[in-house]
Every structure is written in structure tokens, then in C-alpha cells.
């Protein structure tokens, strides 16, 4: 069994780390390099950088700060933001990223997943899915362009169907961004995660809702996710990664200790 992963998430806007609640009302929380370095030294297993303003503005993530990050940290990191072509993906990997993640561009052109997987290998290709629970219809729906609340919209895809489809196209890993829980610190949506896990044969990363050590434990133990991604609790130093890993280890979760 592979060790479970603790993954700080850094949302980037205008070259600063920002954070909102339910993908809205973003505020600046710090410098990209400073936070990346802090998390790498504190025992994070990898980092994820989402340039959330790139796709809505028809731009591509800034490769300059990717190169700078690669020079100051020694753990794997994944980058997302407006990656629409194989050429762009290659440039980002050449700048030092270990993986690339696509979200809205994959919804527009699903064949992009297959093209990236065929040329770069599935291990490099992550598909990030912004999933929203519609309480009226009682279904989970996929949203796109969520980095800009004025452009965000619900797609025709239900979340489980999209999870199945991206695997067919060659996604090597799936990050499930649970929008209803994002920034709320009330725990991950375990029901949704358990259901997705039944149909997900690639590594599954939970994102959205972490507020306590127990929430991480529940995601690993009860939903069998491969990694737990969080932002607010790390940015605001509510949870210390080293102590979190010690807790998980004592609870029987296989984890890489700092």
C-alpha cells in the first residue's frame, strides 16, 4: 500500500496566493515562494498550484514563478491554469513542474486528456473536477471557469459520469474539488467521496472542507482517498503538517513521517 499524501493547495491570482470560500471572495494570503518553501520544509508530500484566474481570462499559468519554485523546494508539485495544448504542458513541465492539472480546458476538449497522456504519460496528467451539489435536484454537477464567479457555470456533466469519462481518456489522477465544502472547515463530503471511490481506479485526491485532524483521518479511513488536499488550515497555521502526520500515523494511516 502506498503512503497517503498531505497536499497543501495554493490558489494563485495575479502571482499571489489567494483563498476564498466556496470559490468566491478571494483574499491575498501570502507570497508564492514563501508559502511553497514553508510547506516543503514542514513535511508536505507535494504541492498543488492553481492559477485560478488563467482559464477565465484565456491565459496560461505564468512559467516564471514555476521555475522559481522548482529552485527552492525539493518535493513534487503540480501546476494548473489555462493549459490548453500539449506545447503549453511541455513548457510547464520543462519549467520544473512534476505534473500538470487540467480542469475547464478538459471539459471544453476532452481529447486533450488523451493527447497529454499519450505524449507525457498518465503519471503527469491530473484532472481536477469542481463538483457542486445541487440540493434541489439532489445531484452532483460539474462546474467550469470557477476561478471567476462572474463566468462560472454548471456544465451538462454529472460528477460521477465525468469521473468515469476522464479515466477513459487517460487521466492518471483525479482531484475532486468539493465546492460546497470549500473553505467551510466542516469536513470533506464523505458520502460523495465514497461513491466516487467505487468508480475511480486512479489515485483520488479529496479537496474542500478540511478543518481538523479528524477530517483528514475520515477521508483516508472512511473514503480511502489517496491524498487529502487543503488550503485554509495550512495558510492560517491552524494545522501543523508535522503534528497532523504524527496523529494519522498513530491512528494507523500509512503516511510518510517528517
Curated annotation (Swiss-Prot):
Catalytic reaction list: 5-[(5-phospho-1-deoxy-D-ribulos-1-ylimino)methylamino]-1-(5-phospho-beta-D-ribosyl)imidazole-4-carboxamide + L-glutamine = D-erythro-1-(imidazol-4-yl)glycerol 3-phosphate + 5-amino-1-(5-phospho-beta-D-ribosyl)imidazole-4-carboxamide + L-glutamate + H(+)
Transmembrane domains' residue ranges: none
Lineage top rank: taxon: Bacteria
Main location: cytoplasm
GO MF entries: imidazoleglycerol-phosphate synthase activity; lyase activity
EC number: 4.3.2.10
EC category name: lyase
Pfam families: His_biosynth (PF00977)
Keyword line: Amino-acid biosynthesis, Cytoplasm, Histidine biosynthesis, Lyase
A GO BP annotation: L-histidine biosynthetic process
Record carries keyword Cytoplasm: yes
Pathway annotation from the record: Amino-acid biosynthesis; L-histidine biosynthesis; L-histidine from 5-phospho-alpha-D-ribose 1-diphosphate: step 5/9
Subunit structure, as described in the record: Heterodimer of HisH and HisF.
Record-linked HAMAP family: HisF
Biological role: IGPS catalyzes the conversion of PRFAR and glutamine to IGP, AICAR and glutamate. The HisF subunit catalyzes the cyclization activity that produces IGP and AICAR from PRFAR using the ammonia provided by the HisH subunit.
Annotated protein name in UniProt: Imidazole glycerol phosphate synthase subunit HisF
Organism from which the protein derives: Blochmanniella pennsylvanica (strain BPEN)
Amino acid at each position: 500500500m502506498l503512503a497517503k499524501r498531505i497536499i497543501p493547495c495554493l490558489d494563485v491570482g495575479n502571482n499571489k496566493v489567494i483563498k476564498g470560500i466556496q470559490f468566491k471572495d478571494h483574499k491575498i494570503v501570502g507570497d508564492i515562494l514563501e508559502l511553497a518553501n514553508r510547506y516543503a520544509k514542514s513535511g508536505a508530500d507535494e504541492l498543488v498550484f492553481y492559477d485560478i484566474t488563467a482559464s477565465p481570462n484565456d491565459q496560461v499559468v505564468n512559467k516564471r514563478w514555476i521555475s522559481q519554485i522548482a529552485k527552492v523546494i525539493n518535493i513534487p508539485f503540480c501546476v494548473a491554469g489555462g493549459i490548453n495544448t500539449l506545447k503549453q504542458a511541455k513548457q510547464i513541465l520543462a519549467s520544473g513542474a512534476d505534473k500538470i492539472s487540467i480542469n475547464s480546458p478538459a471539459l471544453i476538449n476532452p481529447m486533450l486528456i488523451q493527447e497529454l497522456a499519450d505524449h507525457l504519460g498518465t503519471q503527469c496528467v491530473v484532472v481536477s473536477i469542481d463538483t457542486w451539489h445541487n440540493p434541489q435536484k439532489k445531484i452532483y454537477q460539474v462546474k467550469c471557469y470557477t476561478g471567476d464567479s462572474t463566468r462560472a457555470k454548471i456544465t451538462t456533466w454529472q460528477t460521477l459520469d465525468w469521473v468515469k469519462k476522464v479515466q477513459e481518456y487517460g487521466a492518471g489522477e483525479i482531484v475532486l474539488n468539493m465546492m460546497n465544502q470549500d473553505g467551510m472547515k466542516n469536513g470533506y463530503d464523505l458520502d460523495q467521496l465514497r461513491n466516487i471511490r467505487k468508480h475511480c481506479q486512479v489515485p483520488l485526491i479529496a479537496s474542500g472542507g478540511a478543518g481538523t485532524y479528524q477530517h483528514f483521518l475520515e477521508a483516508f479511513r472512511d473514503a480511502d482517498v489517496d491524498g487529502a488536499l487543503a488550503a485554509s488550515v495550512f495558510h492560517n497555521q491552524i494545522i501543523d503538517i508535522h503534528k497532523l502526520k504524527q496523529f494519522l500515523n498513530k491512528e494507523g494511516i500509512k503516511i510518510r513521517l517528517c
